[in-house]
Amino acid sequence: LDAAEKMKQEGVTHVVLLPLFPQYGIETTGRAIAHWEALIKNHEIAARPTTAIWEFASNDKYVEALNERIDQGLQRFPRKARPDVTILFAAHGTFVGDSKDNKDPYCCLVHHTVDRLMQKRNHDHAFKLSFVRDGGWGTSISIDLKNQFSDLARAGKRAVLVVPVDYVTEQFDTAYMLDVKARTEAEASGIAYYHVAAGLNCHPLFIEGLTDLVVESIVPSSKKPEMLCVEACPRTGWHGKDEPEGDKCSVCPFLSNPKENKTARPSQRHGSLSTASTRDPVSRKS
């Protein structure tokens, strides 16, 4: 409401909504945009011509910024350990259940980000993807993440670089979870070298990517939003809850015909313990 009041004072006539969640999720981007719509519907803020940026999971500059953070993170390991570092991508686990029940595209989009990153790196390191929360926004570490550390140690992988893949800033709770609690679990499992890549924060390429997205959203285009995964189309008829914040977004971009979109290979694969030099990335399995 404070932002809306400031917009009124400054004479803003058009709005671009840019939720800072790279991967669309019903309970993140969807909830944020639905809340904005509810404020307008309830006449709490003025209606203005509005466009929204739904996701940027595979945006080139976002991916390149993440790639640079990986390079920087690898430099923190002893030189002799760098070739054997496993990249462990860390994503929220809170909404994965919704991906199954509501066909939320979140999980699939996370995989697309990881795939794009590892393709850019030519699969130069072994990698895994872990969802770090079993549910809720607390600081409890998921069983999945604990198991990942144990599996890596048993496989002789004792150097791990954790890369936050759907966190764009270093929030206190996230930093504490990954750099303190997860480190304790990793060391207890036998991981000898453990580092967490820096968040994107104000990385120049990331900011450029966001700028490009905003410009593209206000330039007239005949291009329709694309759905990255054939299973990602959320169900229709989301509205109906009493609380405005609980509404699902009414204009999700993932409602196109699935037959017209490319099929992704979502969720079955969470990485590879082999690098490109020893294994074809197309054939990797969980």
Walk through the language-model features, giving the residues of each:
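Extended amphipathic ligand-handling, pore-lining, and cofactor/metal-binding catalytic surfaces
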Residues: 1-286
